UniProtKB/Swiss-Prot annotation:
It holds the Pfam family Chorismate_bind. Heterotetramer consisting of two non-identical subunits: a beta subunit (TrpG) and a large alpha subunit (TrpE). This is Anthranilate synthase component 1. It is an enzyme of class 4 (lyase). Mg(2+) binds at residues 348, 485. The gene is trpE. L-tryptophan binds at residues 56, 280-282. Chorismate binds at residues 321-322, 436, 456, 470-472. Signal peptide: none annotated. Its EC number is 4.1.3.27. Part of a heterotetrameric complex that catalyzes the two-step biosynthesis of anthranilate, an intermediate in the biosynthesis of L-tryptophan. In the first step, the glutamine-binding beta subunit (TrpG) of anthranilate synthase (AS) provides the glutamine amidotransferase activity which generates ammonia as a substrate that, along with chorismate, is used in the second step, catalyzed by the large alpha subunit of AS (TrpE) to produce anthranilate. In the absence of TrpG, TrpE can synthesize anthranilate directly from chorismate and high concentrations of ammonia.
Length: 529
């Protein structure tokens, strides 16, 4: 079946690459201009554990060129009892046990492979998340908040089989990565044949029809349980304002968690987020447990990167200052002017830009850190933000993982100064943050990285969706306002969950030939919901 389909990577090319590449991609490009990223995900990944879908909508409007589907991941690196542990097949020669960040860096070095021209931006790598509480491995913090969800502080999939959807071309590049553990000719040929077999399986899956996913939906007000009442959250804000007045911090970013009982499929929440809240970082990730089943799912629509590393260039985009979008272009322009003229918002933004410069200064070559495009407004689907860009060149001997940990966690989710703000957060929040305020993204084997801050994100496990949101508290903050602001930020995901629960498939009961329309009454259950 399909064995006659040529791979872009020939056996001879593969043999040559295997001489000095530990990870060798074998690719096949197919025309798939009738597929959407979601239909391709359903066909290729089928909602299985250890699969993912990563997309991007620039400024909440036009979709970016690429969507990435994680089809297969034989291994995942996570943490158990404070030690690094591999789930699934342990990669040959990969370290295990000990400090998880050291094991991750050693794995990236073990699999380090120079970028190859012509490949999509993500072709293999470690894809997953760092929870906010990973910071406890970087800084000494008190342990006061209840660790009720018991989430791992880190889990990264070793993504070997990836599909890259090119929206500009209407093509999908299927990628089966062969990990070259043993450079003998026999082993290299075996690795190539195995990669071709996986490409054939992916190609066949893409060619299969799917049941219709056409559905109606509505947008009801979301249900939720809040951790705090408006009075309780107001008391937290008042306490932090007092701490700021006493000189303990300039800004602190408290939050609270919201919960919803739901049995809705995470992919349907993702579908609704694509409709209602498209953002620069969209992600669906089914996180495996030790048995190989899905332990929990992550669904998110984040507007904000923590850090990106591309060809040695490190970039972070501090975001601070928000206005809701207007109904018209004229309203948007007025709101932009108001935001840029707001002295309080500008002061907060400058503080976070300085924090970003300091973070990058820890890992970049001295003299290369620059602030570019300072304090401009970017519009998203529902809000507009004040944004700046801070860049630098990665220092000698520094890695993409160093850049991630230097910036972690985001100042926009902790405060300034960062460590003291996190200590104050630990004193006032009821439960550990878990995923909220951490990051979702990837480190590839060519030394690049791209991580989004885990906000506007749901963690779905055992019939409950957890959504967390907060906001920056400064000297003149108001408790009731901050409560409403945090609730509004959570609504984007809570609304998507509520809408997903109303999805009703339209089952017409008759398979129609392409281009043929059913006659009146031909389908016995036409229109039945």
């Amino acid at each position: 079946m399909h064995a006659h389909l040529a791979a872009t990577t020939s056996r001879e090319d593969f043999r040559q690459l295997a001489v000095d590449h530990r990870v060798v991609p074998v690719t096949r490009k197919v025309l798939a201009d009738s597929e959407t990223p979601l239909s391709a995900y359903r066909k290729l990944a089928a909602n299985r554990p250890s699969t993912f879908l990563l997309e991007s909508a620039e400024n909440g409007r036009s979709w970016s060129q690429w969507s990435f589907i994680g089809v297969g991941a034989p291994s995942a690196l996570t943490i158990r009892d404070g030690e690094a542990v591999w789930l699934g097949t342990v990669p040959q020669d990969a370290p295990t046990g000990g400090d998880p960040l050291h094991v991750l860096q050693a794995t990236l070095e073990l699999l380090a492979t120079a970028a190859m021209p012509g490949l999509p931006p993500l072709s293999s790598g470690m894809v997953g998340f760092f929870a906010y509480d990973m910071v406890r491995r970087l800084e000494r913090l008190p342990e006061l908040a209840l660790n009720d969800l018991q989430l791992p502080d880190m889990l990264l999939l070793l993504a070997t089989d990836v599909a890259a959807v090119d929206h500009h071309e209407g093509t999908i590049t299927l990628i089966a990565n062969a990990v070259n553990w043993n450079g003998t000719d026999e082993r290299v040929d075996q690795a190539y044949d195995d990669a071709i077999a996986r490409l054939d399986v992916m190609t066949a899956a893409l060619g299969q029809p799917l049941p219709s996913t056409i559905a109606t939906f509505s947008r009801p007000d979301p249900r939720r349980r809040a951790q705090c009442t408006i009075e309780e959250y107001g008391a937290i804000v008042d306490h932090l304002v007092d701490q700021i007045a006493a000189g303990e911090a300039f800004q602190v970013v408290p939050s609270q968690r919201f919960e919803v009982d739901t049995d809705v499929d995470p992919i349907d929440v993702y579908r609704m987020l694509r409709v209602t809240n498209p953002s620069p970082y969209m992600y669906l990730l089914h996180v495996p447990n030790s048995d190989g089943a899905t332990g929990f799912s992550i669904v998110g629509s984040s507007p904000e990167a923590l850090v990106t590393v591309k060809d040695g260039r490190v970039t972070t985009h501090p975001i601070a200052g928000t206005r809701w979008r207007g109904q018209t272009e004229e309203e948007d322009q007025l709101l932009e002017k108001e935001l840029l003229a707001d002295e309080k918002e500008r002061a907060e933004h400058l503080m976070l830009v300085d924090l970003g410069r300091n973070d990058l200064g820890r890992v970049c070559t001295p003299g290369t850190v620059r602030v570019e495009d300072y304090s401009h407004v970017e519009r998203y689907s529902h809000v507009m933000h004040m944004v700046s860009t801070v860049t630098g060149l990665l220092g000698e001997g520094r890695t993409a993982l160093d850049a991630v940990t230097a910036c972690f966690p985001a100042g926009t989710l902790s405060g300034a100064p960062k460590v003291r703000s996190m200590e104050l957060i630990e004193e006032v929040e009821k439960t550990r943050r878990g995923l909220y305020g951490g990051v979702v993204g990837y480190l590839d084997f060519a030394g690049n990285a791209d991580f989004a801050i885990a906000i506007r994100t749901a963690l779905m496990r055992d019939g409950i969706a957890y959504v967390q949101a907060g906001g920056g508290v400064v000297a003149d903050s108001n408790g009731p306002y901050e409560y409403i602001e945090a609730s509004n930020k959570a609504r984007a995901v809570l609304n998507a969950i509520a809408a997903a629960e109303t999805l009703t498939s339209l089952d017409f009961g008759v398979a129609l030939a392409p281009g043929r329309v059913a006659a009146r009454g031909e389908a016995g259950n036409q229109g039945r919901l």
